[in-house]
């Protein structure tokens, strides 16, 4: 029995399949760091983390300190890497909870050292190298080698890992990724020439895991592929069998017959051309169903029907004139499968000119996640 008028179904067996597929195509000597930032790309970080760790992931990664603490509070004890910037106040909590931090300046390292020393603890860090993303990271040059030397000398810091991030690995042209990886491996060589051998080396994001096995090193960082979605249409999708984990569903809340020339929703931008049957749905842009999808479709009784009129904050309307026996309480699939028909995240993305990553992250926190085991 459905207890919510709107919900996101998260198929944990799909995530289990995906992590096993990632493990299958990854160098068996490489660790798998499951990326569960942004509430596991909207899927629910705690549940997803647990299923990943039970099925082949060795550790986790998040973007922010609050995300790491949520996992610790849920009883997850494995290593967790924070990719992003943390304030001095946050560093204290990270060190206390044995959470690994990303370092891309001597100043950050000194802050961690000061706090770790005060707490009488050792803090593990990973060095970030900017090989072409032009975001966070040391540039792969001689001065950076000297800085990393200084960081390694800090008594309460353990330099456990070093990594870079690819900017264009999901493209069919592999030139830029090859260049980035070459810069990274050359920098690793320069470090080793200076007596700095950092144990964990990682570069592969989802696209590189699929298309660039030479970049797997001794750890990979799957993100979007954990959730059954491909990084782009340009990667070699045939190499890995992914199953989408999220479906978004709602219940019909009202059905009415309206005459020809009835205006629907804000702005009166839609007008019926004949007598029509209109159903209301309890989903709107506050749930992640953006107003830009007003010309989209949903599924009911295994068939497509159009969204009509502007999408409201909490509701929208659909035209079910072509469907028999539509009743309050019927299930409507916003994306996912209904019988033999489906609406994919990618279809939404094409309508909006955006990517699948953004769309699953858009499903707001007020939408309950229902986990299917």
Curated annotation (Swiss-Prot):
Pathways involved: Amino-acid biosynthesis; D-alanine biosynthesis; D-alanine from L-alanine: step 1/1
Function of the protein: Catalyzes the interconversion of L-alanine and D-alanine. This organism is able to use both L- and D-alanine as a nitrogen source. May also prevent D-alanine from interfering with the use of L-alanine.
Residues recorded with modification N6-(pyridoxal phosphate)lysine: 37
InterPro entries: Ala_racemase, Ala_racemase/Decarboxylase_C, Ala_racemase_C, Ala_racemase_N, Ala_racemase_pyridoxalP-BS, PLP-binding_barrel
Gene Ontology cellular component terms for the protein in this record: cytosol
Highest taxon listed in the record's lineage: Archaea
Residues that hold substrate according to the record: 135, 313
Name of the protein: Alanine racemase
EC number: 5.1.1.1
Catalytic reaction(s) noted: L-alanine = D-alanine
Keywords: Isomerase, Pyridoxal phosphate
Organism ancestry: Archaea, Methanobacteriati, Methanobacteriota, Methanomada group, Methanococci
First-level EC class: isomerase
Molecular function as annotated in GO: alanine racemase activity; pyridoxal phosphate binding
Keyword Isomerase: yes
Cofactors named for this entry: pyridoxal 5'-phosphate
Any matching Pfam family: Ala_racemase_N
Family: Belongs to the alanine racemase family.
Listed GO biological process terms: D-alanine biosynthetic process
Disruption phenotype: No growth on D-alanine, however able to grow on L-alanine. Slower than wild-type growth on a mix of alanine isomers.
Location of the active site: 37 (proton acceptor), 266 (proton acceptor)
């Amino acid at each position: 029995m459905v207890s919510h008028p709107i919900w996101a179904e998260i198929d944990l067996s799909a995530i289990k399949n995906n992590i096993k597929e990632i493990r299958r195509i990854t160098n068996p000597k490489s660790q798998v760091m499951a990326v569960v930032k942004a509430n596991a790309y909207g899927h629910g970080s705690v549940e997803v983390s647990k299923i990943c760790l039970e099925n082949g992931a060795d550790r986790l990664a998040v973007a922010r300190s609050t995300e790491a603490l949520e996992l610790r509070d849920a009883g997850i004890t494995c290593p967790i890497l924070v990719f992003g910037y943390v304030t001095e106040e946050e560093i204290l909590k990270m060190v206390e909870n044995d959470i690994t931090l990303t370092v891309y300046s001597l100043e950050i390292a000194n802050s961690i050292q000061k706090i770790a020393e005060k707490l009488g603890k050792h803090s593990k860090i990973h060095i970030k190298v900017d090989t072409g993303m032009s975001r966070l990271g040391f540039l792969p040059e001689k001065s950076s080698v000297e800085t990393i030397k200084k960081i390694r000398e800090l008594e309460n810091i353990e330099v456990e890992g070093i990594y870079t991030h690819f900017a264009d690995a999901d493209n069919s042209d592999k030139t830029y990724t090859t260049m980035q990886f070459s810069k990274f491996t050359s920098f690793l060589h320069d470090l080793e020439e200076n007596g700095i051998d950092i144990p964990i080396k990682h570069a592969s994001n989802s696209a590189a895991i699929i298309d660039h096995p030479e970049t797997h090193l001794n750890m990979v960082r799957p993100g979007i592929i954990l959730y059954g979605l491909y990084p782009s249409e340009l990667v070699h999708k045939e190499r890995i069998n992914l199953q989408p984990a999220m479906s978004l569903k709602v219940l019909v809340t009202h059905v009415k017959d309206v005459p020809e020339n009835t205006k629907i929703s804000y702005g009166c931008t839609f007008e019926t051309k004949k007598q029509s049957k209109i159903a209301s749905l309890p989903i709107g842009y506050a749930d992640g169903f953006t107003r830009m999808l007003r010309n989209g479709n949903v599924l009911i009784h295994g068939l497509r029907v159009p969204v009509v009129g502007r999408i409201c904050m909490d509701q929208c309307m659909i035209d079910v004139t072509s469907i028999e026996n539509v009743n309050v309480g019927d299930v409507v699939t916003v994306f996912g499968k209904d019988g033999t028909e489906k609406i994919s995240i990618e279809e939404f993305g094409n309508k909006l000119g955006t990517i699948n990553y953004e769309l699953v992250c858009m499903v707001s926190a007020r939408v309950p996640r229902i986990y299917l085991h």
